[in-house]
Regions:
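Extreme N-terminal starter segment of soluble prokaryotic enzymes
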Residues: 1-4
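Active-site metal-binding loops of divalent metal-dependent hydrolases
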Residues: 9, 165, 215-217
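Short catalytic helix/loop segments, enriched in acidic residues and glycine
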Residues: 18-33
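Phosphate-coordination/substrate-recognition cap region in phosphate-metabolizing enzymes
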Residues: 31-112
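Short glycine-rich phosphate-binding loop at a beta-alpha junction
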Residues: 39-45, 148, 158-161
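Acidic, low-complexity terminal tails and accessory targeting/binding regions
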Residues: 73-93, 147-158, 170-245
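Internal catalytic-core helix/loop-beta-alpha segment
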Residues: 114-148
Length: 245
């Protein structure tokens, strides 16, 4: 099995839609995916993800199944120190000096229990994503068994998930068995980037997942479109024109 994890295009967060740049990116993505074999497409129920998927669906003559658990992983009551007493809207974009000193945030089973996190249902929210993903994979022949997957219906189907950066990190953390926060803090998936994940079945019936390519944006480069800076911060503090907070 192959999973294509696709982030939405350049976002207009206020209106949960795409910017003009994001719409261009979505059409460039479609021109790439038209030549890819994709068997099933699933989308977040948020506007920016569905708008990103639309050109691909039209180009391929396919329909997508919307899934609520693919919505952005937005825990909105996080007590990040840089918010000076206010509650942060997301559980990523931490300053390194605030999160790296808290070992529990590296723990895949307990990261959401840290007392700096005020979201009361964080664990339940993560569980909902895990269960949604495992139910989807079971429907495609791969049943979760501990930290790997059992299959008696192995296949080379390709499924595409049009979703979000934070949610994508939670998906990867579950498939790879690591905490999501180091992924959220250490990786940047540009808008319309494609992350490719394959199953590996080295022994019959026992499968795991491996990331073959993360955050690919070649469809933008071949069209002379610079990837959006979204999900990144300034390379140097002195770069005043780049995002600092």
């Amino acid at each position: 099995m192959r999973i294509l994890l696709i982030r939405h295009g350049d976002p207009d967060y206020e209106n949960d839609s795409l910017t003009e740049k994001g719409r261009r990116e979505a059409h460039m993505l479609a021109s790439r995916l038209i030549n890819e074999r994709i068997d099933y497409i699933y989308t977040s129920t948020m506007g920016r993800a569905m708008e990103t998927a639309k050109p691909t669906l039209e180009a391929k003559g396919m329909k997508a199944e919307p899934l609520d658990w693919l919505r952005e992983f937005s825990a909105k009551r996080i007590r990040r120190p840089d918010y000076n007493g206010e509650l942060a809207p997301v559980c990523w974009d931490w300053l390194p000096e605030d999160w790296t000193v808290r070992p529990v945030l590296y723990d895949k089973d307990n990261w959401f229990k840290d007392d700096i996190m005020a979201e009361p249902d964080m664990g339940s929210y993560e569980k909902m994503v895990h269960e949604g993903l495992d139910t989807l994979l079971a429907g495609h022949g791969y049943e979760r068994e501990g930290m790997y997957y059992h299959t008696d219906k192995a296949n080379d189907d390709t499924i595409a998930l049009f979703c979000h950066f934070g949610l994508g990190c939670v998906i990867l953390s579950h498939l790879l068995g690591i905490a999501p926060l180091p992924l959220m803090q250490g990786f940047a998936a540009a808008p319309t980037s494609v992350t490719t994940i394959y199953t590996e079945e080295r022994r019959e019936g026992i499968a795991s997942f491996r990331v073959a390519c993360y955050g690919d944006t070649t469809h933008l480069y071949v069209n002379n479109e610079t990837p959006s800076f979204s999900a990144r911060f300034c390379e140097m503090y002195s770069n005043k024109e780049e995002r600092h907070d």
